[in-house]
Amino acid sequence: KWDATEALKLIEQEKITNVTGVPTQSWEILSHPEREKYDISSLEDLGGGGAARPAEHVKQMDEQFEARPSIGYGLSETNALGTLNGGDEYLQYPSSCGRVVPPLTDINIIDENWNTLKEGEVGEVVIKSPGNMVGYWKNPEATAEVFNDDGWFKSGDLGYFDGPFLHIVDRVKDLVIRGGENISCIEVEAAIYEHSDVLEACIIGIPDERLGEQVASAVHLKAGVELSQEDIQKFLAGKIAAFKIPFEVRFFKDPLPKIASGKFDKPALREIFSND
C-alpha cells in the first residue's frame, strides 16, 4: 500500500532518481510535513499519469524540487502509449498531458459519429497504435464497443488539442451534468487546488431533483486549518463559472479515500454524500 513516509525513506536509502505514479502520490511527497528530514536530492524526475495533475501542483513542484515534473497520458489498453509532457514545455503548458508520442501513436478527437473534430473542440479521445491491445479477454462484445474497423480505440476520455498539445477534460462517465451543462471535474478541482490550504480535492456529481446533478466537493485541508463551505465558494468566484462552483463542500479530517492505484475512490465518496 502506498505510504508517502515510506516513499521518502526509500528515496533517501536507495538514491532513487525517478518516481512515477498517479499525481496524488507526488503531491503527497511534496506536501509531506516532514519532507525536509529526508535527503531526496537524488530525484531527477517526478512523473505522473493515470489522472490529471493540477497546474498549481506543477508550479509548486518546480519551485520546491530540483527534480523536474513530468506527466504522460495513456491507458492499459494502449500499453500506456499516448502523450508525454515534461521539462520547460510542461511549465509552459501545465494543464496539458503533452505531445503525441511519435512515431508509435496517433491520437484523434471525435464526435459520437466518429467524425474528426477541429482543434479546440472537445470530443472523445481515440488512439491508434501498434501498442493497442488486441481485445478484451473472451469479451468480443466489449471489444467491438471500443474499436472501429480501422483500429482506432475509444478511450472513454474527453479532450481537445491546442496545437500539438493534448488536454484531457474528464472521463466521459465522470462529467457532472447540471441542468444540461457539462462540467469538468478536473477543471473545478484545479481551481480548488489553487487555495494554499487545500491538500486534496475531489469533485463528484450528486443527484438533484430539479437539475439532475449538482456539483459536490470533498476536501482535505492542511493540518490545523479550518475553512467553511462558503470560504471555498467565495475563493472560486471569478475563477470558474458560477454554475460550476460546488453546491456542497464537505471537509475530511483524514486523506480522501482512494483505490489501489492511488486515484480517488469516487464511488465511495458518492456513497458518503448520499448517506449523510
Region roles according to the model:
Residues 5-8, 27, 35-37, 144, ...:
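Short hydrophobic/charged patches on amphipathic alpha-helices used for structural packing
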Residues 8, 13-21, 30-92, 102, ...:
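Gly/Ser/Thr-rich phosphate-binding loop
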Residues 11, 19-22, 113, 129, ...:
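AMP-binding/adenylate-forming catalytic core of the ANL superfamily
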Residues 27, 59, 95, 141, ...:
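Active-site phosphate/pyrophosphate- and oxyanion-stabilizing loops and adjacent acidic/basic residues
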Residues 50, 74, 98, 157, ...:
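Active-site glycine-centered loops adjacent to acidic/histidine catalytic or metal-binding residues
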Residues 52, 85, 92-138, 163:
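Adenylate-forming AMP-binding core of the ANL superfamily, especially NRPS adenylation
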Residues 109, 256-257:
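Hydrophobic beta-strand positions
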